[in-house]
Amino acid sequence: MNNSTSHSLAVKTPLSRLYLALFSAPLLLLSPADFARAADAIFDGDSRITETLGYTGDVYVGRNQRGNLLIDNGKITAYNINIGRLFDGQIYESVVTVRGPNAELNAVNDQYVLRGDLNLGLGTLRVEEGALASAKEIVVGTTRGYDSHLIATGAGSRVTS
């Protein structure tokens, strides 16, 4: 008696695996290039962060509507950070303020190629009162035709790349 069960869609031969790979590869190309993954965080509207938050994905501020994010002596770390970025033909003016000596906004700076970007589209990043914003690469003006601003004020405020 054979106790193993086999699903009717199970791939049983190497040739079937090849067909499955050829069939599924174009499906990946049909999805939008800029879709949110489950690990991504989206801050639309007004938000205030006073704690440490880490994301194993990207952070979007102002993705579906205007975003206004205040990091008040809190910390956000994510793979990439996008402020006021064009999505699905729409762009919303957004502001991120990082305020206080313990406040940080960090895009992960590691050896992986697709991590570490801080992108400003139609957005403003304000670093105030001793706060820190850091990324492997900071791009101000990612979207042609829209204004972006990066402002650091106050003693000890830092922007590093």
Positions of the model-derived regions?
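Beta-strand-rich extracellular passenger or scaffold domains
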Residues: 19-22, 26-161
